[in-house]
Design a protein with these regions (language model features):
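Conserved nucleotide-sugar phosphate-binding/catalytic loop shared by glycosyltransferases and other
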Residues: 2-10, 27-74, 305
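Active-site-proximal region of nucleotide-activated glycan assembly enzymes
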Residues: 4, 32, 110-170
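Donor-nucleotide binding loops and adjacent catalytic segments primarily
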Residues: 20, 24, 41-50, 169-171, ...
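An amphipathic, basic-hydrophobic alpha-helix
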Residues: 64-93, 111
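Acidic donor-binding loop of glycosyltransferase active sites
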Residues: 91-93, 236, 248-263, 270-271
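C-terminal alpha-helical cap of glycosyltransferases
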Residues: 318, 335-353
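A short, well-ordered alpha-helix in the C-terminal region of glycosyltransferases
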Residues: 324-336
Length: 353
């Protein structure tokens, strides 16, 4: 009888894309894969080709809100729905990637004595994973951190989709219309873009395009028409098809420091200048992610508070100067093969070679 696994995680792309990396590899090993998510979450849009089961999920907030009361009832309902689904499926394992949909699933699995493995992408665990730690047999960590549950924790890195690693440099250059005479700088700030990065790049664009061919993923509704005619500069809101070729064409990256993005850079061995989301706009996870990558020699960091035309140019020049050093450090990383590491832990846990 085939082994069976349930994946869960959602609410944001960061809680889904590592699962997307796992799905084809699990199927290749003959494992039956199911997904539990919400009806209106991004996971419902992104997950294809495997059975998808819907439950309710309520958000647990760290601050006072009237929605906290109604969401408690959603969590209770979701727990009951998850328990019913898991009782019917009887999987060998639940792999929970985080996001609030994973909480009722992990709790229900523990109640039914189904093993649970958590994966934490960020340097510090999000609230959903904190609520599931006691229910888990193992916790896969993207970062080499000390936690209160070290006996359960395993350093794995974060799973990255294999298709992102299979791009063609020449195809990427052709798509962008670059001739390869200059280093290619990839600039990205997530699906919504990063206005602070966009503004700094725009202010330095003349000098930057003298040194680099630039592909700039500016985010939804953030294109700058004034730059359309500029040589060695291509802007997009975002790229879906052919992103792997764009990655292959890039020599350097300028980016926020969300866990998914920086582990993609690590797997690609793409040196990056990271501008973490400031504490005023986050729980500080990007700051810690970036500091870790800089300490390991995988990237350089420029805080948003210090970001301007001059500091950006200087930091990118320094990144280019030390590019080969960073590539060597990334090549020696134990976290780079997050996909293989997590697959091995799952296989070991359910007895699949």
């Amino acid at each position: 009888m085939n082994k069976k696994i349930v994946l869960t995680g959602g609410g944001s792309a960061g809680h889904v894309t590592p699962n997307l990396a796992l799905i084809p590899k699990l199927l290749q090993r003959g494992i039956e894969v199911h997904y539990i998510g919400t009806n209106d979450g991004i996971e419902h849009t992104l997950v294809h080709d495997i059975p998808y089961h819907v439950i309710e999920a309520g958000k647990m907030r760290r601050y006072a809100s009237a929605k906290n009361i109604s969401d408690i009832f959603k969590i209770i309902k979701g727990y009951g729905q998850a328990k019913k689904i898991l009782r019917e499926l009887r999987p060998n394992l639940v792999f929970a990637k985080g996001g609030f949909v994973s909480v009722p699933v992990a709790w229900a699995a523990a109640k039914l004595k189904i093993p649970v493995i958590l994966h934490e992408s960020d340097y510090t665990p999000g609230l959903a994973n904190k609520l599931c730690i006691k229910k888990a047999q193992k916790i896969c960590l993207s970062f080499d951190t000390k936690t209160a549950h070290d006996s359960k924790s395993i350093l794995t890195g974060s799973p990255v989709r294999l298709d992102l690693l299979s791009g063609n440099k020449q195809a990427g250059l052709a798509k962008l219309g670059f001739n390869g005479s200059k280093p290619v700088l990839l600039i990205m700030g997530g699906s919504l873009g990063a206005q602070a990065i966009n503004d700094a790049v725009d202010s330095a664009i003349d000098e930057l395009t003298e040194k680099y061919s630039i592909v700039h993923l500016r985010g939804r509704d953030k294109l700058n028409p004034a730059l359309n005619s500029l040589a060695d500069y291509k802007q997009f809101e975002y790229i879906e098809d052919g992103l792997n070729d764009i990655f292959a064409a890039a020599d350097l990256a300028l980016s926020r420091s969300g866990a998914n993005a920086i582990f993609e850079f690590l797997a690609l061995k793409l040196p990056a200048l990271l501008v973490p989301l400031p504490l005023s706009a986050s729980r500080g996870d990007q700051i810690l992610n970036a500091a870790y990558f800089q300490k390991r020699g995988y990237a350089r960091v420029l805080e948003q508070e210090s970001l301007n035309r001059e500091t950006l140019i200087t930091a990118l020049d320094e990144l280019q100067t030390h590019r080969q050093e960073l590539i060597l450090n990334m090549a020696q990383s134990t976290e780079a093969d997050g996909l293989g590491n997590v697959l091995n832990i799952i296989a070991e846990s359910i007895g699949v070679i």
